[in-house]
C-alpha cells in the first residue's frame, strides 16, 4: 500500500486499509459494474456486499494492473463520472507543489483550508487573497456581515494574505485568525513584522464588531472612536484593551520557501486549540515547518486509465 493512500482528508479516517468509506466503495463498485455492462470495461462484475474489506479487495484486484495506489482510482472514468465532489475532493489530501521547497500557490492554500472547513463546522476561510482584497468586492471581505456569520454558527474566521497586489506575482504569505465568540484576533507573519495597513483596517472592523457585541448598547456603538491606530508596537487603543488583538514580533522564518506553510500551520494550530502565545513564543524553524507539507498534501504522479 502506498503512503499516499493513508493521507486521508482531515475529516476522514483511515480504517480497514482505506480512506474510502463503505458507502464510497459501494458507490464505486456499482459504477464499475455499470461500465462492465456497457462494455466499457472488460472484467467480471463485483458482488455488492455491505462489507468494506470485500469491496476494497475486489476493486484492488480489478485495478491492480493500472493503479498502484487508491488515489489513482479517483482518476478512473467509472469513478469520475459519479461527479461526487466530496468523494473526488475530500477523500485524500490535496495535491501539493512539485518541489519540496516550491512556494505554495493560492490554489494549494485554498485546497488545504477547504478541507478543514469540512472538519470544523464553525470555521469559515475567506481565501488566500492579495493585499488589495478590499478593492476586490468579489472576495467578500470588505463587507463581511459578522452577525450573519455568528447566526450561521461560523465563529472562527481564517484569512491568508499575500503582500503583493492582485496584478503582481506574489511576495510573502501571512495569516489572520479570529474567534468571534472569544473576541480574539491574532495575526501571524513568519518574519515577525507589523501587519500592513490594509490588514490593520480589517482588524479594526472585526475589533469594532467584537467590542460592540460585548460593550455597547445597540444605540451607543456609533459613538465609538474608530480613528485609533491598531496593532501598534508598544501600546493598545481603547478597543484593543478590551478584546484580544495581537501580532507576533519575533521572527520564525529564515529561509525563502515556507511562508505559505507557516500561514497554514498557524491557522490549523489555532483551530486545534493551541494558544496564540505558545505558537508565537516557541519558534518553529523552516526545516520543521517544511515537514508539514507531508501532512497537508499528497504528491502528484502520472496515472493510467482502465479500459
What are these regions (language model features)?
Residues 1-174, 180-185:
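Cysteine protease catalytic domains with a Cys-His-Asp triad
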Residues 15, 21, 36, 117, ...:
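Compositionally biased, intrinsically disordered low-complexity regions enriched in proline and serine
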Residues 21, 105, 196-199, 285:
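A diffuse structural propensity rather than consistent per-protein peaks
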Residues 24, 112, 120, 137, ...:
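Generic alpha-helical secondary structure signal
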Residues 112-116, 202-209, 295:
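Residues that form generic nucleotide/phosphate-binding pockets
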Residues 151-274:
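Cysteine protease-like catalytic core of ubiquitin/ubiquitin-like
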Residues 266-307:
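Contiguous terminal or domain-adjacent regions
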Amino acid at each position: 500500500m502506498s503512503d499516499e493512500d493513508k493521507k486521508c482528508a482531515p475529516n476522514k479516517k483511515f480504517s480497514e486499509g482505506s480512506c474510502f468509506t463503505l458507502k464510497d466503495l459501494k458507490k464505486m463498485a456499482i459504477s464499475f459494474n455499470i461500465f462492465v455492462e456497457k462494455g466499457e470495461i472488460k472484467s467480471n462484475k463485483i458482488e455488492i456486499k455491505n462489507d468494506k474489506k470485500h469491496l476494497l479487495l475486489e476493486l484492488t484486484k480489478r485495478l491492480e494492473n493500472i493503479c498502484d495506489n487508491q488515489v489513482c482510482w479517483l482518476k478512473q472514468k467509472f469513478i469520475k463520472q459519479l461527479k461526487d465532489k466530496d468523494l473526488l475532493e475530500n477523500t485524500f489530501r490535496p495535491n501539493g507543489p512539485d518541489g519540496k521547497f516550491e512556494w505554495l500557490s493560492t490554489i494549494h492554500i485554498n485546497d488545504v483550508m477547504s478541507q478543514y472547513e469540512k472538519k470544523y463546522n464553525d470555521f469559515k476561510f475567506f481565501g488566500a487573497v492579495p493585499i488589495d482584497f478590499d478593492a476586490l468586492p468579489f472576495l467578500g471581505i470588505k463587507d463581511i456581515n459578522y452577525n450573519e456569520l455568528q447566526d450561521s454558527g461560523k465563529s472562527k474566521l481564517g484569512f491568508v494574505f499575500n503582500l503583493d497586489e492582485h496584478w503582481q506575482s506574489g511576495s510573502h504569505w501571512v495569516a489572520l485568525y479570529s474567534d468571534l465568540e472569544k473576541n480574539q484576533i491574532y495575526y501571524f507573519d513568519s518574519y515577525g513584522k507589523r501587519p500592513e495597513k490594509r490588514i490593520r483596517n480589517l482588524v479594526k472592523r472585526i475589533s469594532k464588531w467584537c467590542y460592540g457585541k460585548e460593550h455597547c448598547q445597540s444605540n451607543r456603538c456609533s459613538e465609538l472612536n474608530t480613528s485609533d491606530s491598531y496593532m501598534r508596537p508598544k501600546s493598545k487603543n481603547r478597543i484593543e484593551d478590551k478584546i484580544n488583538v495581537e501580532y507576533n514580533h519575533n521572527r520564525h522564518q529564515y529561509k525563502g520557501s515556507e511562508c505559505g506553510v507557516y500561514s497554514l500551520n498557524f491557522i490549523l494550530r489555532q483551530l486545534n486549540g493551541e494558544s496564540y502565545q505558545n505558537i508565537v513564543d516557541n519558534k518553529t524553524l523552516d526545516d520543521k515547518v517544511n515537514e508539514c507539507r507531508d501532512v497537508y498534501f499528497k504528491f502528484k504522479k502520472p496515472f493510467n486509465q482502465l479500459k
